[in-house]
């Protein structure tokens, strides 16, 4: 899926970077423009959990109603994104120009116009333990709202209750970085039928297998670590045992 926004970020990441004390000008006028012509609103497991809670439905039902699932072309990870609607590619959670889950909106929406990422060397991703990671912030192109307010990156994140060193975000990025190269190795080792089963288990454990009445993060850590250990175990098996 070649979304131009994601391609722009990949090609211009360094020039878009901002320090936590850097300032930017932006004022949200609640015009809803950032909720249309969007194909890049990816849902993390925490996003799915919070949205399902807000709408009082299971994670499975939320994904079935509002999302699309696919395999990342390069990461080979199961990915969940909000499924845009209609010719204007409207976010499915936009109703009467308002977000249906405003207080539980995906982190990528809450942070706009900021974005965040970590960068991990491919060699490090192959290791059992990753080196310490640092969250890097970027300013996305702004084509909505106005520029009547000035904010620092730090203040903007704090206003939405997003930690600068977000424990969950770091764990999720670490999980992706550890799973992705191992999935790619297994794709060379196993047949398509078995890979489909492995990906299905990962998708369920990472995105769906949660009790909404219990704190999310401990459940996520258990599920994420279980997926990593599963892939390590399968990779360690002789080919004939893994099949």
Where is each model-derived feature located?
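Short loop/turn segments that flank or connect secondary-structure elements
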Residues: 1-43, 47-243
